[in-house]
Amino acid sequence: MYLGHIREVVTFLTGQYPGLRLLLWDDMLRKIPAQVIRESGITQHAAPVLWFYTPDLDTEQIGKIITKYAESGFSTVWFASAFKGTTGPAQMWTPLNHHLKNHLSWLKVIQAMAKFPTIQYQGIVLTGWQRYDHYSVLCELLPVGIPSLALCLQTLVNGGFTDTTKKRILELLGFQNIHLEQSTCEGTGSFPGSEIYHMVERVNVQLKEKALKVLEEESAIEGWFSRYHRRHRFGNPRNLESFGSKLIKTFEDWESFLQGFRTRLEAVFFPDTVEEWLEENVNVQLEPLRELVHDYREVIQLNGRPKSR
C-alpha cells in the first residue's frame, strides 16, 4: 500500500516536473525488503533520506541500511541530522553537545561512503523541529537554536570541530566563548534573535529557581501565610511584612522583564505562538507566585482581621 501510494505520487510529480527527484524520509522503507522496493519502480525518481538524531550513531546499522538501499536500486542517498528539537517534546533550551555529537557521527558516515560505490551521497538535511507533531507543545524556539545551527553547520563545512571552527562560530554569532557541556554562550551575541536567546536563557535558568525559592524557602510563608490562611483570608500583619517586600519585588521584577520579553517575541512570532510558549514555560512557574502576591495584597489590607468562616 505504501509503495503503491509513493509510486502514484512520484508518477504524478515527475510528469508535472520532468527531471524532479523526490526525497523520501526513510522510516517506512527500512522494513520493506530490497527486492520489493526495486520492483515498485520508485527508485528511478526518488532518493531515501536516512535520518538519525542521537549523539552516537550506530554506524554498522547505518551501513547495512545504505547497502540495502543500494540493492533496492536507489542511485543516491541523503542523510538527516538535527540541530534542535529532538531531545524532548517540551525542551526549552538546546543542548549543544548533544547536537554537535550527532553531526560528528554523521561526518564519520559521510567519510565512509566510498565503501558503497553503487550509491552516491547527495547531501545532509539539518532539521530543526518546532513540534513533534501537530498536537504537541512547542519545543525550542528558533532563536534559541541558532547557536546550535551555527555550531553544526560549521562542523559539517570544516569536517570536524576544531579551534578554527570554534573561532569562526564565535565570529558569526558575536559571542566571546561557547561552553558545550553547559550549553551556554558568553557575550551579547549579534545574530538576529540574540535578545530572545538571552531572555529565554534567563527564564530557563532563573525563573523556576527564583519562584521556588520565594515559595518554598521562606518559612514565614509556610508558617503564617499557608493555603489555609489564604483561603480564610487572615494573617498577622507583622509576620506578613517579614516576607512581603521580598515577595513583591521578586514578582514585580519578573513581571517587568516579561513585558519586554513578550514585546520581543511578538516581533518575531504569531500571537498564538507567543501565548502558547508563555503559557507552557512561564505561567506554569509564575502563576503560583502571582496568586500568592494577589492574596498577600488583599490580606495585608485587612490589618489582622480574624479568620473568616
Where do the protein language model's features map onto the residues?
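Substrate-binding groove of N-acetylhexosamine-processing glycoside hydrolases
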Residues: 3-309
